[in-house]
A protein has these predicted regions:
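Short acidic/polar inter-strand loop motif in beta-rich domains
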Residues: 81-83, 129, 143-149, 212-213, ...
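Basic K/R-rich, polyanion-interacting modules in nucleoproteins and related proteins
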Residues: 273-323, 409-420
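Bacterial Sec-dependent N-terminal signal peptides
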Residues: 1-26
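Low-complexity, Pro/Ser/Thr- and charge-rich linker/hinge segments at domain boundaries
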Residues: 28-31, 156-180, 387-411
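Aromatic-rich carbohydrate-binding modules that target alpha-glucans
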Residues: 96-120, 213-222, 312-361, 373-402
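Ligand-binding face of N-terminal immunoglobulin V-set domains in extracellular IgSF glycoproteins
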Residues: 114-142
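Contiguous beta-strand segments within globular domains
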Residues: 35-80, 177-191, 302-315
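Short, compositionally biased P/S/T/A/G/V-rich stretches that sit at domain boundaries
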Residues: 25-52, 160-175, 289-302
Length: 420
């Protein structure tokens, strides 16, 4: 009975922790004409937007739904571990070149598409703007009138030889449930060459599941504090609902239905794509997915940025009755933002949640999420939560030296869990 009571206590704590809205900055689109924002480090579309200091490149792509040229500029700000702007540094302390007033000059118009758009591409670092130190960065893209259009968040980590060591492991025999619905992360941190005398103030940590910021775990207290590092074991803060495999579809042309698509039609004005109706998942069934990631591409895999059209994608989730809270489509391509354009409406006649989202041709993985009345995310009941679910966990470690002026990103690792 004592064990059951303990597990119930952990579940109550988990219910709160899982759904707490993260205070971190996330990519944000502020101009309604902007679509298909992609932020990719080192050409790895499955990874977080993190590059190594002095090595690697961050590519930012987006479309403006017009053929009119708009002059977009950008500014770069360094942020602390909690994503608040760093106030103790001058621009020259963190940027080589110029932190503000730089223009995006790589511009192309769409070709042979029903939806006309202008494609913009920016790479960081470049000839006029290069990050000089590690940490979090906020890049704001704005128009000629000074109105913010896009906010992009990315990270720069210390080189591998100057990083702390991070080890991750995942167990399904958790302090909440045993081989049922949860996964618990165990983490170990080695300081290596860093001088840490007060880890409570010098070390900050973030643990994410599938790159999601809405259920990220911030600065969990470690169970073990050692002279050379920290260890988190059986930590209630590191218990996650396992969820289920992400759903997915791929649209490579406006003519042929491909993976996950039941049919495509043209209504005289727009192309429409209909993913297969999402039925309730009563059991776990492995299905390889990309954990929310997306990739713009077309059937020719040629000029994908300017010759890929847009489709009106009709999402439909079968559900016997409405659930408490609002239901959203969620993936990397929604930027963990629960906005009206990703919200689903319940249709009594078909007993399903439905919404239509305009998307560019490509591969998309996604999940259905409930946002409760307190603004916290929950598992969609029809999707289920199974301990076998393949999830990827990411750990970020920040360090501030004694008397230091800012937080450095000194550790990052990613661990993919696969049930045996």
């Amino acid at each position: 009975m004592r064990m059951r009571k303990g597990r119930n206590t952990v579940l109550l704590l988990l219910s709160f922790l899982f759904s707490m809205a993260a205070v971190a900055q996330r990519h944000e689109i502020l101009n309604e004409n902007i679509r298909s924002l992609q932020v990719v480090a080192n050409k790895d579309w499955l990874a977080m937007p993190i590059m190594e200091l002095g090595n690697g490149v961050l590519d930012i792509h987006f479309d403006d739904l017009t053929h009119e040229y708009h002059r977009y500029s950008y500014k770069l700000e360094h942020c602390e571990a909690d994503w608040k702007p760093t106030t103790s540094l001058f621009d020259s302390d963190y940027v080589e070149g110029f932190a503000n007033g730089n223009t995006i000059d790589n511009v192309e118009q769409s070709l042979l598409t029903n939806t006309i758009y202008t494609h913009y591409h920016l790479s960081i670092p470049n000839e006029v703007c290069r990050p000089k130190i590690s940490g979090n960065y906020l890049l704001t893209i704005y128009d000629d009138d000074g109105n913010d259009a896009i906010k992009v968040c990315f990270m720069v980590k210390e080189p591998f030889t100057q990083s702390m060591g991070i080890g991750l492991n995942v167990v399904t025999n958790t302090d909440a449930t045993i081989n049922t619905a949860h996964q618990q992360v165990e983490m170990e941190l080695k300081y290596n060459s860093y001088n840490v005398t007060n880890p409570q103030t010098q070390i900050k940590t973030v643990l994410l599941q599938n790159k999601r910021w809405d259920n990220a775990r911030w600065n969990a207290k470690p169970q073990y504090v050692m002279s050379d590092g920290l260890r988190w074991s059986h930590n209630a803060n590191y218990i996650f609902w396992a969820g289920n495999e992400y759903r997915k579809f791929e649209i490579l042309s406006t003519d042929v239905a491909s993976t996950g698509i039941e049919r495509i039609r043209w209504d005289g004005a727009d192309f429409h794509a209909y993913p297969f109706i999402a039925l309730p998942r009563l059991n776990y069934l492995y299905d390889e997915d990309a954990n929310g990631a997306f990739l713009i591409r077309n059937s020719n895999n040629y000029n994908i940025n300017t010759e890929s059209d847009y489709m009106q994608v009709h999402f439909q989730l079968s559900c016997p009755q409405p659930v408490k809270g609002d239901v959203y489509v969620n993936g990397d391509w929604t930027y963990d933002r629960f906005l009206p354009q990703y919200k689903m409406a319940y249709d009594e006649e078909s007993k399903s949640y439905q919404t239509v989202i305009p998307l560019k041709l490509g591969y998309y993985s996604y999940q259905y999420i409930v946002l409760n009345e307190n603004g916290r995310t929950e598992i969609m009941p029809t999707e289920g939560s199974y301990y076998q679910t393949e999830n990827t966990y990411q750990a970020l470690v920040y360090y501030r030296e004694q008397g230091g002026r800012t937080d450095k990103l000194v550790g990052y690792t990613s661990f993919k869990f696969k049930a045996r």
